[in-house]
Amino acid sequence: MSAASPASIIQELASAAKQYENNESGAREALIAQSRALIASLEVPSEFIQHTFWSQPALSAIVRLATDVNLFQYLKDAQEEGLSAEALASKTGMDVSLFARLARHLVAMNVITSRNGVFYGTALSNGLAAENYQQSIRFCHDVSRPSFGAFPSFFKGNGYKTPALGTTDGPFQSAHKVDISFPQWLVGNPPYLQYFNSYMSAYRAGKPNWCDNGFYPVADRLLNGFDASVSDVLLVDVGGGRGHDIATFGSQFSPLPGRLVLQDREQVINSIPADESRQFEATTHDIFTTQPVKNARAYYMHSVPHGFGDEDAVKIMANLVPALAKGYSRVLLNEIVVDEESPVMSATNMDLIMLAHMGAKERTEADWRSILTRAGLKVVNIYSYPGVAESLIEAELA
């Protein structure tokens, strides 16, 4: 199948623009995807090479440098007045010539703007000034970028084979000259552990979550049909960390017809600040043991089997089976489902992050169906939101 023509892509862009003006779900993501497709349809190979190997690496390095000199913060604070090259060079401790050259590339890449010798922040650069994004930039540049850079030499050396899950011999180890796993390295390098946590938080920030309008039909699939005589528990968030997802769910659908239960390891649960206003109960649970809360309306997992191999993923899912009420309880997996026919960049990005750092992978629909079937479950439906990497897999007892 040949690639779409520029004319047809422009038509799709116009349609997405109208949807965006009408605030329709997925319109923003469609605009971005079609804009990238238009560029790809117009670029010649020499432009692609320059963009890929000059423009983007330079941008990455300059944005990383900007976190050391607080460039985006200064521009944000200046607001509509902006700052001259001389003023910004003074604030950042750079010489004017160097600053101007770096800043011009940020302008060329639409990160900041300039007019009559004055530089201004944009919505994008002002957002990047936030500390969680500053830390995310440091993690991605210092840790991930070298790991990707090791792909050619590492895979040539290992005969182009996929590393073992949880490997101590992968692209990450090759790039950083270590022989320990990525999680072990993070623990031994505290600043980057914090940067990684910020990155994971920032990764999901500003994106639709599974219970938003237009994603998973919560009212139809969970609230309607809830039966307190079967169980007074509406939702169990299994391995839910400190409760971000379940708190979001509770706030969006209050008042709730049933209880919300958060489960995670003891050290995680103990780290949750006391809050009498929260709508969920926090309890300890090991995902490799049988689920103790019986007959709940739904058991939700967000990226829980994600980091495990297939055999462990089957065990995790099978531990839910004894707790499920036939024809009533639902299993909800909030996971990336890689589309083999029309993959989206947000999904392939995360798949390659997993490959680079841990020898892991994101799963296709066929992969998820196989795991759930082996665990004694069956897929009812897979709900997706346009342009969003993570889907919502609904399953039930087979």
From Swiss-Prot:
Activity sensitivity to pH: Optimum pH is 8.0.
Main location: cytoplasm
Record-listed E.C. numbers: 2.1.1.-
Positions annotated to bind (4E,8E)-10-(4,6-dihydroxy-7-methyl-3-oxo-1,3-dihydro-2-benzofuran-5-yl)-4,8-dimethyldeca-4,8-dienoate: S144, Y199, R265, Q267, S303
Single biological process term from Gene Ontology: mycophenolic acid biosynthetic process
UniProt-annotated binding residues for 6-O-desmethylmycophenolate: S144, Y199, R265, S303
Binding locations of 4-farnesyl-3,5-dihydroxy-6-methylphthalide: S144, Y199, S303
Binding site for S-adenosyl-L-methionine: D264
SUPFAM superfamilies given in the database record: S-adenosyl-L-methionine-dependent methyltransferases, Winged helix' DNA-binding domain
Binding, S-adenosyl-L-homocysteine: N197, Y203, D237, G239, H244, D245, D264, R265, D286, I287, H302
Biochemical pathway: Secondary metabolite biosynthesis; terpenoid biosynthesis
Oligomer and partners: Homodimer.
Family: Belongs to the class I-like SAM-binding methyltransferase superfamily. Cation-independent O-methyltransferase family. COMT subfamily.
Record's protein name: O-methyltransferase mpaG
Species the sequence originates in: Penicillium brevicompactum
Higher taxonomy: Eukaryota, Fungi, Dikarya, Ascomycota, Pezizomycotina
